[in-house]
Amino acid sequence: IAKPCGLSDLLDLIENRGIRAVVDCTHPFAAQVSHTAMLACDCTGISYIRLERETLKAADYPGVMRTPDFEAAARLVASLEGTVMLTIGVKHLPIFIDKRCGPNPRLVARVLPHPDSVARCLACGLAPEDIVALKGPFSVDFNRALFIEYGVTAVVTKESGTIGGTDAKLEAAAQLGIKSVLIERPRLNYSVVADTVQDVICYLFNQGCSTKGTALVDDKATAPLVRQSRH
């Protein structure tokens, strides 16, 4: 499943396709999707397992400031000076713009190169020169070059894990001696959590399930993991 799916849709899918287990591979910040998947499994009595991305150790990167959510990150950014690059997508951009008092700090948004993403940046009041439309994840060297080009003094990113390129951003910022604002993942009480695809497969077979009867709730960022689990 790689599209928005409400509870009723997921329940119908489970019933119509004889699903016996759900593997939740969604983005760490897709909390509502995970909650819906767990609820659907509770309602139908089938197995649920969360494939969680590795958590980064912020202590490994100098200059990292952790915040519990987007609101806290926006308040922190509003107190900074210079140029802050936001690498958080477009959904929460208005929070950062609303918290800012005046033109400082300068906000530069790095977003996906989709017309809708760019349009939403412009609608928020960002100037074209403050919009970087690129699809990552990128290497440390690429991030370094981008931060230097835009004169970035702080970068804001989500705790998306290595697969989302968070480590490369933090490392690039650390090498340049600039601040990093790291937004922590939402805390959910997952019923069962696995760290690797192999652990997921072992769990499924221990539950008497096979990947053939398993629904994979996924997003594009974790697609390679899902392909592995189908072998």
Task: Enumerate the predicted regions with their spans.
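Glycine-rich, highly charged phosphate/nucleotide-binding loops
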Residues: 1-14, 132-142
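Short acidic-hydrophobic, aromatic-tinged amphipathic segments that line or gate anion-handling sites
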Residues: 1-4, 63-71, 192-203
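Glycine/small-residue-rich loop that forms an oxyanion/phosphate-binding "nest" at active or ligand-binding sites
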Residues: 11-73
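Structural motif
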Residues: 20-21, 83, 153-154
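A short helix->loop->beta-strand "cap" motif at the edges of active sites that frequently abuts
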Residues: 42-49, 105, 175-179
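Anionic-ligand binding region
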Residues: 82-130
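A C-terminal functional module that forms or caps the active site or interfaces directly
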Residues: 122-145, 149-154, 159-176, 181-183
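C-terminal functional extensions of proteins
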Residues: 147-150, 154, 159-162, 166, ...
